[in-house]
Amino acid sequence: MLILTRKVGESLLIGDDISITILNIRGNQVKIGVEAPKEVSVHREEIYHRIRDVKDEQQL
């Protein structure tokens, strides 16, 4: 796992077309912005797991 330190307003890039920007830090919460092409799905981890679980159930 790559671990990076960023400040508010700073970004990191994934590949050529995904940008993640730190928008705000308050206590133990970090607000981030994600810019990605429309064909790239972006989900919070817990939502992704729900989507995957529903798809798995539908295949049974």
Curated annotation (Swiss-Prot):
The UniProt GO MF terms for this protein read: mRNA 5'-UTR binding
- What's in the keyword line of the UniProt record? Activator, Cytoplasm, Repressor, RNA-binding, Translation regulation
InterPro entries, sorted:
CsrA, CsrA_sf
Q: Where in the cell is it found?
A: Cytoplasm
Keyword Cytoplasm listed? The answer is yes
Cite a GO CC annotation.
cytosol
Q: List the disulfide bonds.
A: none
- Tell me which SUPFAM superfamilies the record gives: CsrA-like
GO annotation terms (biological process): mRNA catabolic process; negative regulation of translational initiation; positive regulation of translational initiation; regulation of carbohydrate metabolic process
Tell me, in a sentence or two, what this protein's role is.
Answer: A key translational regulator that binds mRNA to regulate translation initiation and/or mRNA stability. Mediates global changes in gene expression, shifting from rapid growth to stress survival by linking envelope stress, the stringent response and the catabolite repression systems. Usually binds in the 5'-UTR; binding at or near the Shine-Dalgarno sequence prevents ribosome-binding, repressing translation, binding elsewhere in the 5'-UTR can activate translation and/or stabilize the mRNA. Its function is antagonized by small RNA(s).
Q: Which PANTHER family match?
A: CARBON STORAGE REGULATOR
By sequence similarity, the record places it as follows: Belongs to the CsrA/RsmA family.
* Assembly and interaction partners: Homodimer; the beta-strands of each monomer intercalate to form a hydrophobic core, while the alpha-helices form wings that extend away from the core.
Q: What is this protein called?
A: Translational regulator CsrA
